[in-house]
Amino acid sequence: MFDLDKNTNIESNHVKIGNKNTTRRLIIKSSKNSVRIAYAPPEKHFVDVTDRFLLPETETQNLKTRLGIFELEPLPPNGLVCCVLPNGELIQPNDFVLVNSPFPGEPFQIARIISFEKSRPCVSTNLYDSVRLNWYFRPRDIQRHLTDTRLLFASMHSDIYNIGSVQEKCTVKHRSQIENLDEYKSQAKSYYFDRLFDQNINKVFDVVPVTQVKNAPDDVLEDLFKNYDFIVTEYGKGRALLNEPSNCKVCKKWCAFDFSVQCADCKKYYHMDCVVPPLLKKPPHGFGWTCATCSFATQRKKSTFQKENANVDANHATENNLEGQATQKSVSILKGHNKALSNVSLQEDHGKRRNLKSLRSSRNLHQQSRKSLDENKPNSFSNVSKLKRLPWNMRYLDLKSDLTVEKKSDIYPSRARISISPMLPTSSEDNLHPLQPLTTADEEMDLDLKSDERFKVDIPTFFERWPFLKDLPLKGYLFPLCEPNLQSAMLLVPITYSDALLDDYLCSCWNLWKKLRLPVSAFVFLELTITALYETKLSPAAAFEKLKSWMPGFGDPKNCTGKRVDEHKINSLVKEFGVSLQCFVEKLKFEYSLKEIFFSFLSWASSPKGLNTFKKLSDSSLSTTTTDSHGLPTCCYDIGMYDLQKILKLKKTPICRWCHSKRSSEWFVAPPIEESSPKDKSKIVALCQRCGYVWRYYGYPLQQATPSDLRNCDFEPVKKRKADWDHLSNHDNEVKKENNRIRNASSLMENPRVSTKTFDNFTLTHDSTINVKADTVKRARQNNIKNKDDVNFSEDRKKCCALCGIVGTEGLLVCFKCGTCVHERCYVCDDYAENEQMLVSASHLSGRTTRNSASPGIVSGKKSYAKKDQVLSWACLSCRSNDNLGQNNDNHCVLCLQSASHSLMKKTVEGNWVHLICASWTPDVYVPAEESEPVCGIAQLPPNRWEKKCEVCGNSFGVCVSSPNSGLTSHVTCAEKANWYLGFEFVKQDQSPFSMLSNLKSLSFFGNVTEINTNKCMINSWTSLRPVLFGPSEQLPRNFLLRNDIVPNTNNSAWSEYIRNLYPKAYIYLLQYTIAVCKPTIAPTNVACCCSKCNSTMSPFWWPGNICQACHCLRVE
């Protein structure tokens, strides 16, 4: 057994090892022209080294050999079945991993491992450095506006990356494999998919599990069960495969979708060739087809009924006393007709029934084969071998074909090639051979061809040199090189080989190697050490002695005896093959021994000529420094992380973009954004460890992170940062409550509606000005209370508008009582609503005392609207109403029954309160743009609208709005909290809308009410906006605009355009409402319900216990 002298002091500025029983870890550090290796106990961490440098000592890997987890047979062509990552995880083919993005500031990419391969520099060497990855796209990668960050889109695209870019494993499942989606999404690094995206044709496909496919031929199903896990079909047509088998009624064979028809009456399938006469094409869309039997029976039945109806009409013309006899006679005739019709149908089918006996045997055999196929069907995805699913575990199934054509390119979805674009100039040669863009099949088949060529060149020679490794399962031991062109490489050893033994061998070899003081990279060191280990058949002690014999004198290669290779030949080989010593051996093995080749190479490398030549090669490969988009230095092993040592030398202070923290153990590169303001060169806008964790793993900012995402942080600094964040949040809440209490005690606003009323701390007089009592002012001065305009209006805390959802302080109105934030353009309009008295500029009152601030100074004749990055203090309508009435309780929305916290409210015609977004997205409810106008139409909502159940909160009270696609219902406020899509449907009309003067007949009291009762508003003569909402996982239409999206041909958001153009519709709706009230209705009847609390008989909806809507909403106590 090989052992290392633990008392040897390793040349390092940080670590000295003297304890034999210390658990050790191998540390690899790279400088410009050298690599240093040292051992360190796990409890000691370097200041400039992170966990990503650590190669932990692992025990013998006992691989699981049961089905679905791992199989040792059949082995891959190169025998490499797994790889040990620096964090100790073992990755295998068909595992899902997180991969570093080649672009700094982007989140981790998610991929499936297909195979371990070699790049061109590693061909003919003993090292592997690459991995082939099958990509799974996030919605943001393919420009899909989906809020579910755990949703992925599968693909059949692959690339070859360096193995060092793989960070760790993750979990990816199909949606059908997940029983409880919410519980699954609460787990760390867990994702799911149910669709596939092809980037060459920019098209989405359905992904259906093979275990659920029924509607396919038996031989096709058997082949699918053996070789694939998923089926890729056209989007929206995957459900056809889940139905029962569609076999032809005539020939009993499976019917292809485009070569068969279905009877509209009996629902049976027929081949178009089996029908007599044969059908040349299918019926057009919107038309049905019936078979001959059903068509003839329907025609006979129709003619018989026409005759009987004529007889019945003649009988009704007789006297009244003969009506009963005519009725009995018609009934008897109908009974006789049914008997005759049944006899006719039996005679017609008599010829076909003769062949039933001959077909029963074939039908029974078909059912038995189908039954046996279902029994052999795998019950779950874990029963399938992982290696048999390589390289692809899914394939494309063209439902328009007969599913019998099998080619190698048929498994890819983009088989159809696109002709050359007519916009490109063409020549005579192009006309003979038109250019066609590459499809997925072309790219992947070309990649397969290149991999096969490298395998054919490299694998036979590798096993010829080292025959003892043949037919053995090998594992790759990852060794980070920290070079831009070769980030990491793998040493191949059997899976039962001890990692600790390999660590000891590499460390002792490095101590021997560094005494030569050669400016070589770690790639040469790995090539020599693994060659010596293979020469001694994996004996580390013997390999160490052989390496010593190759370097006699420990740094004096001139003591070599025997033949020497010419320096000119070595120089030419280095220029041709670089530092690949294995290529040297292949070229010179017939002339020189292995020892003589290494002696000659080391002597040439130590000579001045060799040093100069080799230094140029190493400088060209190692002098490149990784940087981000702003030129700041990043780590060589992870371009998404900043190098702290180099950042400190620049004397710049990093600050987190989202949480504004300045303390973090690691700093990550922030995603690039468009900078409108000049950049502060003394600061580095980055992401702290907590924000970087959420962004890199899930691809969204920290503000949208769920508690489960924060609980899944594995790093100790992240957990500590989370506790500090929670403490800071609690402190901010306490400060906010104290500020609200102070503001309520000394409100600084006008009340024009209340003439005189006395409260505890202040008095309202006829001049609509609040006179604060002296004791309140004195207490405020003693406690050094800040003005209300100096609190919570910092630039670091930008507010989010409750109406359009845009974050920013430009033109923002903040209610100083409830904290509701709205933009001035989203709520206050210049055309109407004299709201200058409601606005008090925060900067205008910053230098006033408490007494002076009681009288808001508004310049007469000028509007005090907000400027850029200026926040205005303001009181919303709900808070002003509570102050006028002397109430302290929150108002509740009549549509969702939730309080008015951080959401703008308006009054209704009936005297209730309603959220502005609830009323806007509820159909048949009119929302006026003017603040003083009430909301109309809630009392006219039908009772069934109050009975729908919300998909988010699970309650059935209030009014829910349904999605136009899936029909999912939810309260508008619940949908906003659950990250549903609230937006508008942008509609272009072919005809001009109605006008008030010319088309008065379009009003409701003239008969047509569809265009008036809806929420659609016209933004110009030909376009309109209609509020709609969609679920988080639904496919959005192309004409859908979010609330904060810019409307085409305008510079305003969709919400501001919508609320601005609602005003002209007010007169039409009020006229309609007035006429509808005056219009006579059905005669009044006795009211059956009476409220048990207020004895009221008027309510749009009655709740259990005979409670009216007003009492249920806590409007009457």
UniProtKB/Swiss-Prot annotation:
GO terms for molecular function: chromatin binding; ubiquitin-protein transferase activity; zinc ion binding. It is found in: Nucleus. Gene3D superfamilies: 2.30.30.490, Zinc/RING finger domain, C3HC4 (zinc finger). A zinc finger (C2HC pre-PHD-type) spans 890-925. PROSITE patterns: BAH, EPHD, ZF_PHD_1. Residues 89-208 form the BAH domain. GO terms for cellular component: chromatin; Lid2 complex; mitotic spindle; nucleus; protein-containing complex. One of its GO terms (biological process) is histone catabolic process. A zinc finger (PHD-type) spans 245-297, 798-882, 948-1002. Keywords: Metal-binding, Nucleus, Repeat, Zinc, Zinc-finger. InterPro entries: BAH_dom, BAH_sf, EPHD, PE/DAG-bd, Snt2, Zinc_finger_PHD-type_CS, Znf_FYVE_PHD, Znf_PHD. A zinc finger (Phorbol-ester/DAG-type) spans 227-282. Residues 361-380 are annotated as: Disordered. This is Lid2 complex component snt2. It comes from Schizosaccharomyces pombe (strain 972 / ATCC 24843) (Fission yeast).
